[in-house]
């Protein structure tokens, strides 16, 4: 979970090699599936842009994945990619909260390793 202040910090520090990927189903799935703010009016892309993140993109369907890939590879960083997905049932397994392991798993999935 990332607080909104993190976007301000990223914009201020401006790491060119950073992409924040926010996968948002509009719900709080782990606490019962209540609707979150983004299910209504909160627009994370506008918040990221207002924080000073230079490259911001929102995708809402699987056919935009190639565009998202191009965005990550070609736009100046830091980048914020807001992936809006459909809500679903919570996973039946416990999540891994180890940041190093999550980073490696995400990188391997992204690179097709």
Where are these regions (language model features)?
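Thiamine diphosphate
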Residues: 1-24
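Short coil/turn connectors at secondary-structure junctions
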Residues: 14-19, 53-54, 75-78
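Short acidic, glycine/serine/threonine-rich loops at helix termini
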Residues: 4-6, 31-35, 91-96
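Short, hinge-like loop/turn segments at secondary-structure boundaries
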Residues: 11, 36-40, 74-75, 98-100
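Glycine/aspartate-rich loop-and-adjacent alpha/beta segment that forms the canonical ThDP
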Residues: 74-113
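Conserved thiamine diphosphate
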Residues: 35-70
């Amino acid at each position: 979970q990332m607080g909104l202040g993190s976007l301000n910090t990223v914009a201020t520090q401006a790491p060119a090699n950073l992409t924040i990927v926010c996968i948002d189903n509009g719900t709080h799935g782990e606490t019962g599936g209540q609707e979150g703010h983004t299910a209504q009016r909160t627009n994370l892309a506008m918040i990221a842009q207002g924080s000073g993140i230079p490259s911001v993109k929102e995708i809402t369907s699987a056919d935009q994945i190639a565009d998202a890939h191009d965005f990550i590879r070609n736009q100046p960083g830091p980048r914020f990619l807001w992936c809006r997905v459909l809500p679903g049932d919570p996973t039946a397994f416990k999540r891994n909260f180890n940041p190093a392991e999550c980073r490696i798993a995400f990188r391997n999935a992204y690179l097709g390793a």
